[in-house]
């Protein structure tokens, strides 16, 4: 997703979280450390 807001809108319903460089947010189980 382009923005974390867009990502969270989609990911929060699946109980996942958003990680990634700005402009390329991904929906993941957990952020890599």
Curated annotation (Swiss-Prot):
Keyword Cell membrane: no
Disulphide bond pairs: 7-19, 11-27, 18-31
UniProt KW Disulfide bond keyword: yes
Record PTM 4-carboxyglutamate, positions in chain: 6, 8-9, 29
Any one GO cellular component localisation term in the record: extracellular region
Single annotated GO MF: toxin activity
Modified residues annotated as 6'-bromotryptophan in this record: 1
Tissue localization of expression: Expressed by the venom duct.
Keywords: Bromination, Disulfide bond, Gamma-carboxyglutamic acid, Hydroxylation, Knottin, Neurotoxin, Secreted, Toxin
Residues carrying 4-hydroxyproline: 21-22
Subcellular localization, as worded in the UniProt entry: Secreted
Function noted in UniProt: Induces sleep-like symptoms in mice of all ages.
UniProt remark on domains: The presence of a 'disulfide through disulfide knot' structurally defines this protein as a knottin.
Listed name of the protein: Bromosleeper peptide
